[in-house]
């Protein structure tokens, strides 16, 4: 369960940061037809309660694609996050365009500008988005409960809940599992605390 949770949370976090940073950079620093419409469509998806799309998504993933009890069913629906795109777009709007223009003058490609200039400058915001995404999927419960039925494919939170039924509420293993599930989050926060606090103040006015 711990390994499953680590795989799912890590892959989803890396994917959302990768796609979110590219989309955020394009929406913040690039001018192209329909940019504002795309951004407002993105915002509108954040207003839709997840319960509205849950049943169609479940039918698509488990019945149409046959991804029940697989890593694909746990990972693919969360590969892109509109919240991450929105947050990174807002953070990248504060980055000075002069640095990117200077890199282009020095014959840097657009990929080089994104990789060597934008990502290092946006590291605090990326850290915050990464922490929120990782924690959210580390503690995810409802979707893994729906798409997994085999014990070998369960995630940590679903596995802990199953102690009530499979082991007649074994409080000892449950408490031990709860502590184990909390430890990685605590370690990650203290390891990235400096970037996390910087990211929370992105866009703030400094006197």
What are these regions (language model features)?
Residues 1-207:
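A structural signal for multi-pass alpha-helical bundles of membrane permease subunits
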